[in-house]
From Swiss-Prot:
Species per Swiss-Prot/TrEMBL record: Idiomarina loihiensis (strain ATCC BAA-735 / DSM 15497 / L2-TR)
Function: Catalyzes the NADPH-dependent reduction of N-acetyl-5-glutamyl phosphate to yield N-acetyl-L-glutamate 5-semialdehyde.
One GO CC term on file: cytoplasm
Location in the cell: Cytoplasm
Keywords from the UniProt entry: Amino-acid biosynthesis, Arginine biosynthesis, Cytoplasm, NADP, Oxidoreductase
GO BP annotations, alphabetical order: L-arginine biosynthetic process
The name this protein goes by in its record: N-acetyl-gamma-glutamyl-phosphate reductase
Catalytic reaction list: N-acetyl-L-glutamate 5-semialdehyde + phosphate + NADP(+) = N-acetyl-L-glutamyl 5-phosphate + NADPH + H(+)
EC number: 1.2.1.38
Pathway: Amino-acid biosynthesis; L-arginine biosynthesis; N(2)-acetyl-L-ornithine from L-glutamate: step 3/4
Coarse class of the protein's main subcellular location: cytoplasm
């Protein structure tokens, strides 16, 4: 399909060497309405000058690009030549870089947590830095594509949701929006593949050390993100497992009295026309069915007033890169699934 100039975008990817960055690069390269200006890493990164395919040889047939150090000259090139910048950088780095590109009139799709929370005072405790960009924080739109399409379409700055929040919110928002949840705390347990820990070597994600373990008890940075979007108290426990990629979230919620299966069916019908949501009432989603796919698979079971809902996603795709593409599609007036199926 041919696209008009208004529907075609030149994009730059900063932080392209990581797991999310290379997935995003692959998706941009395959997207009919996007042209890739360049892939960038920190100016002093050891990856600068490397071929992306050297770091990720499984994509050698798709991605034959050099990783460029983000010098001041490269920043000026991006400002003058790109329409949209994807930030696959550390949270604090995104907060530093985004305002510079936004001030130049570019759109920014931030895949870090730098603009996900509403309040700057939450950042020292959950992200470890003082957030100095309150104005942009208030303007950022949360990029959960199926739920905020109009807001995303009009936004200059989009904060792509975290991987765990994406899985949890996709399972819970239909029930919350329908007013079916009691006021009691929601419990969320989620298991992620090891790519969720990033590319940098760490003992906790070393193959010989890893099995299945909970982490971030009571203090994981995705807890306030989930609670903020649900406007509901949650108890979230993430787990890291010894498989490469994917997330399975299991959520436990108490329903209001007299909520029926029919009420739940009606609530989840909000996904009936969503091309990247696969929903089945009695399904028990499995990670193997979503790995390397842009879908979210959802299922639920009810007993009395207790709801157990499941959600499975690929943490690198629906949990990051493909959701970012969905956001760009909305901004270009394209179908959500454009370039993804």
């Amino acid at each position: 399909m041919q696209y008009t100039a208004a529907q075609s975008q030149s994009v730059a990817i900063i932080g392209a060497s990581g797991y999310v960055g290379v997935e995003l690069t692959r998706l941009v390269q395959q997207h009919p309405a996007l042209s890739l200006l360049g892939c960038y890493v920190s100016e002093h990164s050891s990856d600068a000058g490397s071929l992306l395919s050297d770091l990720h040889p499984q994509y050698a047939h798709l991605v034959k690009l050099s990783l460029q150090g983000l010098s001041s000259q490269k920043k000026e090139l991006i400002k003058s030549s790109a329409d949209t910048v994807f930030l696959c950088t550390d949270h604090g780095v995104s907060v530093e870089l985004a305002p510079e590109f936004l001030a130049a009139g570019l759109k920014v799709i931030d895949l870090s947590g730098g603009f996900r929370l509403n309040a700057t005072e939450d950042y020292p405790s959950f992200y470890g830095f003082e957030h100095q960009q309150d104005s942009w924080l208030q303007q950022a739109v949360y990029g959960l594509a199926e739920w905020y399409p109009q807001e995303i379409a009009a936004a200059q700055l989009v904060a792509v949701p975290g991987c765990y929040p994406t899985a949890a919110l996709m399972a819970l928002l239909p029930v919350k929006q329908a007013g079916l949840l009691s006021c009691n705390k929601i419990i969320i347990n989620a298991v992620s593949g090891v790519t969720g820990a990033g590319r940098k070597a760490a003992l906790t994600s070393h193959g010989a050390e890893l099995s299945l373990q909970a982490y971030g008890l009571f203090e994981h940075r995705h807890t306030p993100e989930i609670a903020q979007q649900l406007q509901h108290e949650v108890l979230f426990t993430p787990h890291l497992a010894q498989f490469p990629r994917g997330i399975l979230a299991t959520v436990y919620a108490e329903l209001n009295d007299d909520v029926s299966d029919a009420d739940l069916d009606k609530a989840y019908q909000c996904y009936a026309d969503q091309p990247l949501v696969r929903f089945e009432k009695q399904a028990r989603p499995a990670i193997k069915n979503v790995v390397q796919q842009p879908f979210v698979d959802i299922g639920w079971h009810r007993q009395g007033n207790q709801l157990i809902a499941f959600s499975a996603i690929d943490n690198l795709l629906k949990g990051a890169a493909s959701q970012a593409i969905q956001c760009v599609n909305l901004q270009l007036g394209l179908a959500l699934e454009e370039g993804l199926l």
